[in-house]
Regions:
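Beta-rich interaction/scaffold domains
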Residues: 1-207
Length: 207
């Protein structure tokens, strides 16, 4: 392998694919090699040629691609936040689905040989956004507390006209609980129910 052959191989590399620090190290070595091949061949020993080829190969071997840096960033973000172990059942399905999709996309790109830096950077951004947009569901305790409160109101205890008004709100709350809710939703529903209950009129004692 001659120094010229090695330089020709290096010339085919594209600067935009590599980190600037590692590219600079390679180019410094290339400059030395270019000076070296200008020398009179009669003055160059075989050992010097072997050493120069070796130095060029080492400088080429230390190149770090921008893609590998982006992959590492993405891997580190997933690992440090333990995203692959996250219990997505704790979150509203709509937000959990977006997150799962972003995580799957990121993991696919990490394994992909031909992933570009742009794709990887975009995947990281989407994953970060999806993580911050995850919204916790209300806990079972919070939902059950509201259901228990609802059970306390029985139609037989109140006048027909006041129950009729209350029942509209009661049914709205009941319908809302059929869907997923955040803690704030459950708190708001509880307040709405309590407010409506204040207008209930107890039936007179008929004994």
């Amino acid at each position: 392998q001659s120094v010229k052959d090695e330089l020709n191989t290096i010339n085919k590399l594209k600067e935009k694919d590599y980190t600037s620090e590692t590219w600079t190290i390679l180019q410094d070595q290339v400059k030395l090699a270019q000076e070296f091949i200008k020398k009179d061949e009669a003055t160059i020993t075989e050992k010097e040629v072997i050493d120069m080829v070796d130095a060029l190969q080492k400088a080429k071997a230390q190149l770090v691609t921008k893609v590998s840096v982006s992959k590492k960033e993405l891997k580190d973000y997933i690992a440090s936040n333990e995203l692959d172990k996250l219990d997505t059942n704790k979150y509203l399905t709509s937000t959990a689905d977006s997150f799962k999709k972003a995580l799957k996309n990121a993991q696919t790109l990490i394994e992909q040989e031909d992933a570009t830096k742009e794709q990887l950077d975009e995947a990281l951004k989407q994953l970060q956004d999806a993580r911050t947009q995850l919204v916790l569901k209300a806990t079972d305790d919070e939902v059950n507390a509201l259901k228990a409160l609802m059970d306390q109101y029985q139609e037989k205890d109140y006048t027909a006209s006041s129950w009729k008004e209350f029942e509209k709100v009661y049914n709205d709350v009941k319908d809302a609980l059929e869907n997923e809710n955040t803690s704030d939703n459950v708190q708001a529903l509880t307040n709405t129910l309590k407010e409506a209950a204040q207008k209930l009129v107890k039936r007179g004692n008929l004994d």
